[in-house]
Amino acid sequence: MSTSPSRTDKIIVVDDDARIRDLLRRYLTKEGFEVSIAEDGKALNRLLLRESADLIVLDLMMPGEDGLSICRRLRAAHDRTPIIMLTAKSEDVDRIVGLEVGADDYLGKPFNPRELLARIHAVLRRRPQPEAPGAPSSENEVVNFGPFCLDLGTRVLLKNNEEQPLTTGEFAMLKALVRHPRQPLSREKLALLARGREFEPFDRSLDVQVSRLRKLVEEDAANPRYIQTVWGVGYVFV
C-alpha cells in the first residue's frame, strides 16, 4: 500500500531517457507527489524559473551539460534543494564525485522505483519540519564550536556570524556528529543516524560527506580539529 507524503511535495525528474522520465512521473505521482520532468539542464533551468522543488532526481550521464555540472552549478548558486543522483551501477567514482559536488544521495541504474522512493522519503525527512504557530521548537538546540554556531532548529551553520551553505545530507551528517560529542561513531551508526539506512560495505560515500564537512569547518582538513578519524572504528566529534 502506498504511503503518501504528509503534504504534496514537488519533485523534478531530470533524465534524457523519456522512458525513465515517464516511469518516474507516473510512479511518483501515484505515491502522492507532484512531479515535473525535464530532459536536460536547460529544461530544468526553465522549470526552476517558474516553480520551486522539494527534491530533484538528477541523472548523471546526459548529453550536453551532465548531472555533475548541473549539481555543481546549483550548489554554487546556493540552491540547497536536495538532489538524488542516478548513476551507472558499476561506476563508484561517479557516485563519489556526485557527493563531492553536493548531491545528497545517489542510486545506481538500473534501479527499482521502490528503492528510489525509499531514498526520497529518507532525504525529505531530513528537512526542517514546520512548527505550529506559537508552538515551541521541537529542536532548538544550538551547538557552538570554535568560530562556528550550528542551530539544529533552523539548520543554519554560522562561522563568525556568516552563514555557511550546507546541503541536506551534510547537515544530517554534522548533526549526527555534534549530537554525540566525544563518542566514536562507526560508519554503520553514522549511516543510520544521518541517512536512516544501513551502511553498505565498501561504500565510500559516507567518507566523502565527512571529507566535505572537514573542508567546511576545519582550518586544515588534513589535520582536523573537530571531526577526527578513529582508526578501525569511524569518526568522532571533539
Walk through the language-model features, giving the residues of each.
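Short hydrophobic/Thr-rich beta-strand motif most characteristic of the beta2 strand and flanking loop
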Residues: G32-G41, L47
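Positively charged, aromatic-enriched patches within helix-turn-helix-type DNA-binding elements
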Residues: V156-V233
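His-Asp phosphorelay/catalytic-motif detector in bacterial-type signaling
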Residues: R7, S52-D54, H78-P82, E200
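Acidic catalytic/metal-coordinating carboxylates
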Residues: D40, D66-S69
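Charged docking surfaces used in two-component/phosphorelay signaling
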Residues: D22-K30
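Active-site beta3 strand of CheY-like receiver
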Residues: S52-V57, M62
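Short, Lys/Arg-enriched segments at the junction into DNA-binding effector domains
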Residues: R7-K10, A122-P184, E188
